[in-house]
Amino acid sequence: MGVCVERTRAHHGDQPAGRTETNDFEPGDIWYFPRGHAHVLECLGNEPTHFILIFDNGYFSEFGTFSITDWIGHAPKSLLAKNFGLPESAFDGFPKQEVYFARGAIPPEQIPENLQGPRIAPSQTHKFRMLSEAPHGVFKGGREWRVDSTRFPISTTVTGVILDLEPGALRELHWHPNADEWQYVIEGDVSVTMFGSHGRFRTELLHTGDAGYIPQGYGHSIENVGSKSSRILIGFNSGIYQSIDLSSWVAGNPVDVLATNFNKPESLIRVFPRKDVFIAPSK
């Protein structure tokens, strides 16, 4: 999954059925390319583009892929000539190794036509305008945009979230039963806690440009400890979003069970929230 920070253009070169798609992306738009599908990214205009990539496997590297230049550069000219029905001389001067970044003319504003190939069906588009949509949830202390395969069908292995927190606000203690969580602080200063079995508890401060990681099933929270609003990009290695919040867990238990577990009077238990908090505002 890619998250556009500055304007860019992405071309999905080929599905197994030969369908193609080219889209322009504005800040807040996202794309998803299934594993093994060809694609290319271009900068539009005179300013640099900026995007953040999320992979569903922490062992994967961007450098673990191969490019069209690398493949053609290593294939014999005789083989290429037969493949494309061209003379061998047509491949004189082609790069002999991978061209990772290629500098060319600024792409035209209008998306050009492909050499051939049917367009991808709208239901399988690789583009989703996340920040152009209304937030998934709005709270006193912040808001959240979320997209998974229920809204973006092609994104079968990754869920994307953008979380805004006001100063002092807390994304409450919670855990994800089906996925690991990767965090990138786009802006702000946040405190992230993590809790595991056998009393393991840790707190880390993350600042703009820092990344964090929470293993599947570990309890955690995110709190804005700065003086300005914070924005966090969050990725999950599952196409279905699942979360269990601590307030919801408490609210779902009988009062007498909680009172017994905590050895506290039922009168105290009854003042706990009886619904999901999700984001708690600053006191």
Residue map of PLM features:
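Short loop/beta submotifs within extracellular cysteine-rich repeat domains
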Residues: 9-12, 18-19, 40, 48, ...
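Short coil/turn segments at secondary-structure boundaries
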Residues: 14-17, 45, 65-67, 175-178, ...
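A short hydrophobic beta-strand segment most commonly corresponding to one strand
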Residues: 46-65, 213, 228-246
